[in-house]
């Protein structure tokens, strides 16, 4: 089950896991576990990742289609 989009965002921005690990002050193995969805970052780490990558936290946990569909559902009610 895919729970986060960190890998996709890293790929889109051309950023390596090693680079992110260094800027997050985490081990490569920790970041790799996030990227491979073996473990999930806590909210504090997710916020740090979003700031480092320059994206909204929502971009790390859902793709554009999911956000679009979610907005459609909210607007119909």
Show which residues each predicted segment covers.
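Short basic helix-loop element that most often maps to the first helix and adjoining turn
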Residues: 4-23
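Short, charged recognition helix plus adjacent turn
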Residues: 8, 14, 33, 59-77
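Key DNA-contact positions within bacterial/archaeal DNA-binding proteins
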Residues: 18, 29, 58
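Recognition helix of helix-turn-helix/homeodomain-like DNA-binding domains
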Residues: 25-40
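DNA major-groove recognition helix of helix-turn-helix/homeodomain DNA-binding modules
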Residues: 44-59
